[in-house]
Amino acid sequence: MITPKVLSGFKDRLPKDAIQKAQLLAKVSVVFQSFGFVPIETPHLEYAQTLLPDTSSDIQKEIYRFKDHGDRDVALRFDLTVPLARFVSLHHQILGMPFKRYAIGNVFRGERAQKGRYREFTQCDFDFIGSESLVCDAEIIQVIIASLKALDLEDFCVSINHRKILNGICEYFRISQVNEALRIVDKLEKIGLDGVEEELKKECDLNSNTIKELLEMVQIKQNDLSHAEFFEKIAYLKDYNENLKKGIQDLERLYQLLGDLQISQNLYKIDFSIARGLGYYTGIVYETTLNEMKSLGSVCSGGRYDHLTKNFSKENLQGVGASIGIDRLIVALSEMQLLDERSTQAKVLIACMHEEYFSYANRLAESLRQSGIFSEVYPEAQKIKKPFSYANHRGHEFVAVIGEEEFKSETLSLKNMHSGMQLNCLSFLKALEIIGENDEDL
């Protein structure tokens, strides 16, 4: 006999969990659509050569890669952005530019499993392809904020940086292994200052003084300074080199655009330590954390990638986008008690006291559904205790009971499972009115 078990880093999703996830995805999908983003789908499995170019060594170690039955070198996608580059390169003449897309799907990374981190997890991506305008970057941040607010989250911060600033810092310190250095800096939250310092010494051959000054610079943060105060504070960096100058100027323009959108300044701050470990980012980058649950890591991250399609097409297409980590958000929202705890999406359970009442019960359930109320019929004529126990376990808000009197008069008795109050022999219209009201009204 096979012992039923799940691989580490993977999980089954029970009805309550699956319902919660579906509700969150529905909410963010509405936000994406409200900004004009359209859905696409790409395969879970790609040619390995599609996924590997410009991918950091850390990510490459986490990719699930193998030979398929045709002896082809294939891999499971580790994000939805690289498949997007392949997709756009293949279909750009049909799509037209600029192109705004969102995609929701599972991705796979063989990283160490821990709280909020899985080896299979769902990403919700939204991207703006085919424009280099910073208006697109501002809109992506606007969508991040709107999406989190749609999930009833208010206390969060989008930490923003620019890869040109990081490149400029590396240029200032004459670091030749730029991508390697930034990959290590990106691990600051994970391994701490000492860990980053040790890796920089080992991998980039930097001396202690250079590392100390480098880490001081990449830890520059806006914190409680106003936008104007912070840009005044870092103005001197523009004189160091063109990369730093261009990066800071882009952030100044971005902040002007976000200010025009009247987004609260508490929701976004500059943080020079934000690097994003994926090698394809070239411009503004960002990570979003919940202020009360920073240990969970970023719940939404992304940035600009101006050369992503270079591996697939002679026509270079710019892009900017972000990805919402829905599984991490579920962990956070659960701890905050902001999730629906029911194991059913049906609001009403209809219970029959006798077999001959099922035809009426089914008609009643269909009438409720046509009125927009999800309903189900308990499949057995039982003593009332059993369907009530079922409703309690699943989380139905109401139980409609069909007994002899209700059957003959074509009415129903209705019990509110939250308040415990019951009304007998209601007409369908009266029951419909009550079910549509708040539970407390019964």
Swiss-Prot record:
Pfam short name (any one): HGTP_anticodon
GO terms assigned for molecular function: ATP binding; histidine-tRNA ligase activity
Keyword annotations: Aminoacyl-tRNA synthetase, ATP-binding, Cytoplasm, Ligase, Nucleotide-binding, Protein biosynthesis
One CC-aspect GO term: cytoplasm
Catalysis performed (reactions): tRNA(His) + L-histidine + ATP = L-histidyl-tRNA(His) + AMP + diphosphate + H(+)
Any one biological process term the GO annotation gives: histidyl-tRNA aminoacylation
Catalytic EC class: ligase
Primary localisation category: cytoplasm
Binding partners and assembly: Homodimer.
Name the UniProt record assigns to this protein: Histidine--tRNA ligase
Native source species: Helicobacter pylori (strain P12)
